């Protein structure tokens, strides 16, 4: 932990150099925001799924640039709660390298490059929710040039944004990296291979016997209108967590494929068996209207289609959080989905999604399924 603090101080000093050279720069500020409006019809034996409408995410924020520096502050509102989202400062060292410090989503696989509102499947794959981290306080170095993209991050656990260090009792930390090779990144011709890896120490838990000796991992059913846990694994007596995820993008003309595999292992104390979990998803995309797919270097993935584009997306996700060797049964999830995206203009998107989700082998939870019809109108600026 002391090493991480020392590294953080060094990074802040690094960000502050050459300020005198920036004196002639102009400060530019622009507002940002988003509104998501959802509606859904559900069919399931689980009575927690009730048809309805919702505004699951509304945000307002500001972006600022000053010479080689950029900053962002984003505040969100959902279901009566206000929360802090992106809060960071970054410094551009060249056209290919930057350093970002603050609270933000660190790079780990394909899904980390797009915000929650820009998922082409409307909701992110369950495997990504189960095995990925949300925003974390830390620092990330980014290198982006030609065929290569790479990041390196150090961070503390997510609860560090919500609680003081004496309330946490201890502060978990971790490191992660995302490496990509993309020999084809032209309009209509896309191919990318990548791999991400991460290491974490145990996280905060409100139960004293589990605090910083456990990991609580899981994912909800793919809807934000009703919040229902689909798979969940509590792993006690934990020493650390390691995970990795290979990824692939391939596209030709108006058709593209995205795929990712996840492997996670929690190393445990004493004679307890290590916990292992895995997952994968595949997404097949096609533009019925809108020309060919383009590449986005900033997102390290497929760019958002142009205004007026109409897109169809087929998705499949499998998540396995039940490990017989460690006797921890978090459940197994299968999900198939079909999504239509209409990109109305630069700021507005309409989505329609049908999905079928089946859960099995979760301790204390009956095998069950959910059929869901959902639609979303979103405004982002």
What would you call each of these model-derived segments?
Residues 14-15, 69, 365:
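Hydrophobic alpha-helical membrane context
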Residues 1-24:
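Bacterial Sec-dependent N-terminal signal peptides
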Residues 13, 58, 62, 378-379:
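Short, Lys/Arg-rich amphipathic segments at extreme N-termini
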Residues 23-160, 166-203, 286-288, 298-304, ...:
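Outer membrane beta-barrel
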Residues 46-47, 209-381:
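Outer-membrane beta-barrel pore domains
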Residues 83, 111-112, 162, 268-271, ...:
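A short, polar/proline- and glycine-enriched secondary-structure boundary/capping micro-motif
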Residues 3-4, 54, 131-132, 331-332, ...:
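Short hydrophobic/aromatic segments of transmembrane alpha-helices and their interfaces
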């Amino acid at each position: 932990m002391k090493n991480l603090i020392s590294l953080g101080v060094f990074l802040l000093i690094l960000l502050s150099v050459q300020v005198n050279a920036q004196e002639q720069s102009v400060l530019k500020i622009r507002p940002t925001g988003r509104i998501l409006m959802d509606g859904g019809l559900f069919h399931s034996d689980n009575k927690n799924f009730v048809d309805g409408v919702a505004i699951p995410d509304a945000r307002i924020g500001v972006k600022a640039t000053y010479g080689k520096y950029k900053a962002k502050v984003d505040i969100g509102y959902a279901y009566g709660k206000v929360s802090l989202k992106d809060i960071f400062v970054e410094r551009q060292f060249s056209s290919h390298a930057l350093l970002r410090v603050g609270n933000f989503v660190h790079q780990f696989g394909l899904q980390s490059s797009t915000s929650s509102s820009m998922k082409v499947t409307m909701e992110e794959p369950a495997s990504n929710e189960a095995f990925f981290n949300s925003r974390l306080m830390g620092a990330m170095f980014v290198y982006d040039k030609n065929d290569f993209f790479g990041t390196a991050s150090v961070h503390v656990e997510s609860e560090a944004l919500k609680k003081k260090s004496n309330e946490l009792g201890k502060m978990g930390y971790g490191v992660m990296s995302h490496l990509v090779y993309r020999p084809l990144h032209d309009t209509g011709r896309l191919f990318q291979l990548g791999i991400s890896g991460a290491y974490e120490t145990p996280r905060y838990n409100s139960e004293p016997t589990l605090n910083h000796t456990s990991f609580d991992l899981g994912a909800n059913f793919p809807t934000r209108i009703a919040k229902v846990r689909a798979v969940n694994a509590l792993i006690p007596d934990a020493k650390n967590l390691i995970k990795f995820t290979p990824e692939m993008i391939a596209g030709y003309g108006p058709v593209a494929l995205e795929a990712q595999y996840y492997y996670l292992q929690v190393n445990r104390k004493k004679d307890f068996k290590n916990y292992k979990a895995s997952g994968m998803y595949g997404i097949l995309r096609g533009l019925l209207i809108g020309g060919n797919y383009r590449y986005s270097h900033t997102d390290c993935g497929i760019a958002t289609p142009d205004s007026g584009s109409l897109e169809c997306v087929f998705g499949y996700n499998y998540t396995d959080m039940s490990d017989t060797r460690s006797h921890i049964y978090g459940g197994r999830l299968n999900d198939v989905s079909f999504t239509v995206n209409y990109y109305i203009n630069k700021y507005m998107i309409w989505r329609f999604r049908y999905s079928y989700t089946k859960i099995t082998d979760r301790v204390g939870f009956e095998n069950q399924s959910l059929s869901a019809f959902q639609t979303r109108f979103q405004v982002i600026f």
